[in-house]
């Protein structure tokens, strides 16, 4: 077991390091487009929240106090839920007999996460994008799931949640993939511009670097290309001598990693810019599907094929995760006036440190909770990936029709001007995580439209953004504290109470109180 853990740890480290490096260098050429040229057009909810924390800390006074109070409220609220189970983390229409009957008989159920952090995220995203995202959830949960539940055999034994995983989520995957391809086509000019700059610098021609203002100065394209080539060379060695052992299959695997990571980097950045959520699991699932099909076509299947596909998917997944997170860092830097080149350089060190530690974390989680068996970590995305790979590698059914439906829907949405990526994210992410975004968006709309004085409305909206940022920061911080306590063996969770109807009703009441607190506190704002 120890040798196996060490072997897996080495694989995790290399996947994380190579994927992280690719994510950084493939995003840098697109920094200016997402951060500068699209300034004011994307909400960047996570970047906004973090920037509010930094700015309020710099200003001090009332803003810092307000942020600290909001962080304490949001953090304490989420902490007592995750650590003690004081009330349920989410409520659903099953809370009453009629709702339970609708869920069991008609497969219609509505869920709502009651967390403070998600409420704050919805406030920052705003009503427009929150509504589009939740519309995708409504289509799946209120049309697709009940419709499928009415025609499948033995429907009584299948829950709406299972129908969502089996039918709704694949439609979302198809939509995300097509929305990503549409985004790639639309951003072809940006891609060509980045490639043109690379060719120009590689040829030794002078660029306008000397006249570029400090806050727009990136690492040189020559250095970026050097890192790309070095990373691909290291991946070549890793695939050949650590995974595949066949040069033809190794070259194919390397091509898959580079092409998909390069193309979907812009999709990951776009998703983070809009909703603050990276659809990396959906894009990784598409990577696994494509890589599995290609690997099977060149004679690699079975367990060795699944292992190869997972390694390829792991590298791409890490690259897209890094790209999505890094665009947030760069946007924050743009707002506070940092030098992008310095951020980019230090990110390489951060990637190396993360790669060295993530393997240990994975091994500890496996030894503490396990990934299979009773009481194991749920790992829903990992289970979905396994379900995708197995039929492709070992023979079975793949939901191509559902992928196709999602892709066609994304094209239709694009043609009528609806952001297909946001809508598809709604189909992929569970309803209970999307519905609170609308609640937060409604709070933002309400507080910013009550006065006839535009200055008052702006002051209220800004104050609410600070409170929402506090909710997000406090919830995230206390979530880490709660996880550390659980890992240390502290078992303070009242499971029997947390699963009761009383806890669910209390959760609904506490959520309403949190919304009321946020709206009341925000409405107190006055223009400076």
Features from the language model and the residues they span:
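Membrane-interface alpha-helices at helix entry/exit sites of multi-pass transporters
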Residues: 52, 56-69, 208-214, 337-349
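Membrane-interface capping segments at transmembrane-helix boundaries
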Residues: 187-192, 450-454, 518-528
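Hydrophobic core segments of alpha-helical transmembrane domains in multi-pass membrane transport
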Residues: 16-28, 69-85, 117-123, 136-146, ...
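Membrane-embedded translocation segments of transport machinery
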Residues: 233-328, 334-335, 364, 376-379, ...
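Short, non-helical or kinked segments that cap or interrupt transmembrane helices
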Residues: 41-46, 127-131, 135, 273-287, ...
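Juxtamembrane inter-helical linkers in multi-pass membrane proteins
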Residues: 37-56, 92-104, 192-214, 374-386
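Structural signature of hydrophobic alpha-helical transmembrane segments
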Residues: 14-17, 102-110, 246-260, 306-319, ...
């Amino acid at each position: 077991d120890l040798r196996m853990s060490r072997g897996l740890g080495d694989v995790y480290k290399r996947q994380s390091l190579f994927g992280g490096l690719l994510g950084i260098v493939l995003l840098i050429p697109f920094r200016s487009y997402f951060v500068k040229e699209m300034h004011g057009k994307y909400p960047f909810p996570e970047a906004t929240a973090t920037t509010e924390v930094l700015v309020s800390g710099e200003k001090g006074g009332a803003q810092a106090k307000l942020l600290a109070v909001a962080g304490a409220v949001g953090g304490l609220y989420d902490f007592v839920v995750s650590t003690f189970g004081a009330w349920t983390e989410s409520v659903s229409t099953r809370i009453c007999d009629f709702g339970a009957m609708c869920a069991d008989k008609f497969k219609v159920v509505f869920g709502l996460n009651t967390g403070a952090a998600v409420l704050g995220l919805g406030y920052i995203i705003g009503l427009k994008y929150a509504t589009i995202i939740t519309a995708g959830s409504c289509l799946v949960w209120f049309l697709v799931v009940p419709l499928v539940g009415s025609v499948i055999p033995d429907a009584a034994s299948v829950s709406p949640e299972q129908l969502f995983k089996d039918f709704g989520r694949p439609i979302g995957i198809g939509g995300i993939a097509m929305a990503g391809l549409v985004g790639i086509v639309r951003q072809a000019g940006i891609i060509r511009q980045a490639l043109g700059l690379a060719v120009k610098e590689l040829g030794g021609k002078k660029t306008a670097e000397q006249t570029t203002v400090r806050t727009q100065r990136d690492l040189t394209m020559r250095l970026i290309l050097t890192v790309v080539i070095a990373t691909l060379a290291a991946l070549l060695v890793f695939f050949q001598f650590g995974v595949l052992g066949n040069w033809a299959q190794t070259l194919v695997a390397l091509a898959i990693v580079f092409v998909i990571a390069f193309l979907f980097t812009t999709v990951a950045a776009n998703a983070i810019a809009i909703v603050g959520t990276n659809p990396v699991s959906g894009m990784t699932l598409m990577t696994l599907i494509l890589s599995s099909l290609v690997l099977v076509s060149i004679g690699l299947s079975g367990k060795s094929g699944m292992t190869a596909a997972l390694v390829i998917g792991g590298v791409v997944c890490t690259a897209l995760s890094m790209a999505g997170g890094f665009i947030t860092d760069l946007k924050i830097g743009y707002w506070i006036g940092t030098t992008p080149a310095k951020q980019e350089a230090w990110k390489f060190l951060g990637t190396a440190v993360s790669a060295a530690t993530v393997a240990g974390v994975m091994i500890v989680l496996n030894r503490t909770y396990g990934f299979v068996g009773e009481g194991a970590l749920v790992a829903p995305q990992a289970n979905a990936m396994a379900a995708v790979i197995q039929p492709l590698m070992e023979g079975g059914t793949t939901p191509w029709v559902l992928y196709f439906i999602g892709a066609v829907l994304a094209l239709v949405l694009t043609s009528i001007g609806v952001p297909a990526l946001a809508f598809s994210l709604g189909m992929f992410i569970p309803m209970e995580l999307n519905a609170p975004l609308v609640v937060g968006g409604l709070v933002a709309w309400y507080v910013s439209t009550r006065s006839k004085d535009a200055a008052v409305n702006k002051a209220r909206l800004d104050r609410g953004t600070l409170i929402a940022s506090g909710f997000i920061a406090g919830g995230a911080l206390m979530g880490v504290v709660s996880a550390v306590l659980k890992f240390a063996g502290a078992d303070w969770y009242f499971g029997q109470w947390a699963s009761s109807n009383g806890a669910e009703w209390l959760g609904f009441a506490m959520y309403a109180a949190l919304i009321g607190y946020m709206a009341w506190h925000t409405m107190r704002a006055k223009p400076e």
